[in-house]
Amino acid sequence: MGLKEYLFGKSSEDRACEFLRKLGFVILERNFHSKFGEIDIIALSSDKILHFIEVKATSGGYEAEYRLNKAKYMKILKTINFYMMKNEPNRDYQLDLLVVKNENFELIENISL
């Protein structure tokens, strides 16, 4: 990944966090890493559900959400399980996808493949 792509991704995640805060989420962690993978954003909703949020962004005309393939999804699930065992074993949680297209945001909640 080049510098331009890195900066675009970071900017998109920054904007995603602001969008989530406006919806009432509290951002707990960003870019959580484990040996299994990474989770872009971990946030707590007003109803106290833990949200693991994968951010996909595009400035082009293609559908960013299709970049979440089965292999990436499985890595995220393993990372969630690791996080839950270590930090929040009894809390309700879900996996969400936040699509950023230019200035538009679409939060797709509780995704599965």
UniProtKB/Swiss-Prot annotation:
Which GO molecular function annotations are given, in alphabetical order? nucleic acid binding
Q: Which InterPro entries match?
A: Restrct_endonuc-II-like (IPR011335), tRNA_endonuc-like_dom_sf (IPR011856), UPF0102_YraN-like (IPR003509)
Entry's NCBIfam families? Answer: PRK12497.2-4
The similarity comment for this entry is: Belongs to the UPF0102 family.
Q: What is this protein called?
A: UPF0102 protein Ccon26_01140
What is the organism of origin for this protein? Campylobacter concisus (strain 13826)
| Upper lineage | Bacteria, Pseudomonadati, Campylobacterota, Epsilonproteobacteria, Campylobacterales
